[in-house]
């Protein structure tokens, strides 16, 4: 509850502190942020070439980072509660969004932002072990039930959370990840 020091002092015990408060908070930024504001600590992974592009002019996607950067991404994935991507990445690359590291004890939750439920029922991400959440703006219970049945995987959850513009409500999604899935980062 954050009142431990005051309780000890109230009991008449002399306490020096807080000590190294910022250093302690830096050890677990996800937990601290989720406990203070109800949102996870979000890391964004981007890569671009020196000319500011993320793909070749033809639209073909190539690795533009070196092995060290790719290893660092895997370490970040291994330490994350969830990995989030958009439907365009899923449609273009058919990723698994898994953490490929010896540090992985349990795969992170995979989350796809797909406002209109365009994901293919045979997308790789839907057929790997582990839980997947598809965040959508679709609110029709009938459409959601039909899509869930077509996907046919009990580890996949459709989560409806539309904003006023008919897109996925990112804040609502992030708050749900903290409150229901204990994803702090």
Regions found by a protein language model. Give the residues of each.
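Zn2+-dependent cytidine deaminase-like catalytic core
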Residues: 1-23, 109, 138, 142
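Proteins enriched for Cys/Gly/acidic motifs involved in redox and nucleic-acid/cofactor modification
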Residues: 5, 19-49
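Active-site ligand-binding patch in enzyme domains
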Residues: 33-34, 43-50, 54-181
């Amino acid at each position: 509850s954050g009142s431990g020091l005051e309780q000890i002092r109230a009991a008449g015990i002399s306490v020096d502190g807080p000590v190294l408060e910022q250093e302690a908070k830096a050890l677990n930024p996800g937990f601290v942020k989720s406990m203070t504001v109800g949102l996870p600590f979000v890391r964004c992974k981007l890569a671009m070439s020196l000319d500011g592009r993320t793909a070749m002019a033809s639209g073909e996607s190539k690795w533009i980072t070196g092995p060290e950067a790719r290893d660092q991404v895997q370490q970040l994935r291994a330490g994350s509660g969830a990995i989030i991507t958009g439907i365009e990445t899923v449609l273009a690359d058919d990723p698994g969004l898994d953490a490929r590291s010896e540090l992985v004890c349990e795969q992170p939750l995979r989350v796809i932002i797909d406002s209109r439920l365009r994901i293919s029922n045979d997308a790789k991400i839907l057929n790997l072990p582990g839980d997947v959440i598809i965040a959508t703006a679709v609110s029709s219970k009938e459409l959601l039930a039909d899509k869930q049945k077509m996907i046919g995987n009990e580890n996949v959850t459709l989560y409806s959370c539309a904003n006023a513009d008919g897109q996925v409500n990112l804040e609502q999604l992030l708050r749900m990840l903290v409150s229901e899935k204990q994803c702090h980062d």
